[in-house]
Amino acid sequence: MATITAAMVKDLRETTGVGMMDCKQALTENDGDMQAAIDWLRKKGLSKAAKKAGRVAAEGLIGAVTSGNKGVVVEVNSETDFVARNEQFQGLVKMVAQVALSVGADVEVIKAAKVGSATVETAISDAIATIGENMTLRRAASLEVSKGLVASYVHNAVIDGAGKMGVIVALESSGNADELAALGRQIAMHVASSNPLAIDPSGVDPAVVKREKDILADKFRQQGKPEAMIEKITESGLKTFFKEQTLLEQPFIFDDKKSVGQALKDAEGKVGAPVKLTGFVRYALGEGIEKAESDFAAEVAAAAGQG
């Protein structure tokens, strides 16, 4: 049996908004497994959390750069936010993004690419030596369309094209470039805000759909719904899930009376041609990286020779 710590209970509460005692019970029932505890709470009808939020602990910057029909987004991590505010580091992130725009989104290819007489990897090493803190190019992604454009949006930007979150969106169209760019930026801002799982239901991981369906079915059984009705009301619940989690079905943040899909269709008049959203990438700094929280009092005691 796993030891359930106060920190684990706190994390679960922050993720789900559920009371401390229910969070502790959920963790106890699931042997400390955070994701299983979230699912357990949802089956009990106590939590609306659709997925584990994950603690964002890494520092650094997201860089997003576009040029006509292609765009890239990169994540460069540092150890502290202090370094992320350093002009040399910010310049490094923009340089890495520009290189990725030329050579593609393979991290190893980016690191091996030449910038002047040196490689990107050497430039990162030089920055580490100068600034005195470890830095890593963690990931990169790119989008391209044959006709149309790739738009971008950077949230909490510290400089143009670099901040704590970056989004690129690919729109395929032969219409007016200025109207398409304005539309693309709005869609990118929507993606940053609403964090969709996929463009439409067909793009959602089947394992995620199955898990959601199982959670809904278990929840309805616990509510005493007749077994004959469960399949039907579960399918209805899945429609709600897709409306909340897929881009084209989400209510558009600039006009929530219509979906993103409807907003795209309505924009075709201004653009002057059909518009198809072919892809999006959303990077939030530190996604999936978990850094142990230090016990400040213990550190002070240890430094004083008391620990």
Curated annotation (Swiss-Prot):
Record keywords, A-Z: Cytoplasm, Elongation factor, Protein biosynthesis
A Pfam family annotated for this UniProt entry: EF_TS
GO molecular function (one): translation elongation factor activity
Keyword Protein biosynthesis attached: yes
Location of the region described as Involved in Mg(2+) ion dislocation from EF-Tu in the Swiss-Prot/TrEMBL record: 80-83
Entry's localization field: Cytoplasm
Alphabetical list of CDD domains matching this protein: UBA_EF-Ts
Gene3D superfamilies: 1.10.286.20, DNA helicase RuvA subunit, C-terminal domain, Elongation factor Ts, dimerisation domain
Cellular component aspect of the GO annotation: cytoplasm
Function noted in UniProt: Associates with the EF-Tu.GDP complex and induces the exchange of GDP to GTP. It remains bound to the aminoacyl-tRNA.EF-Tu.GTP complex up to the GTP hydrolysis stage on the ribosome.
Family of this protein: Belongs to the EF-Ts family.
Name of protein: Elongation factor Ts
Gene name linked to the record: tsf
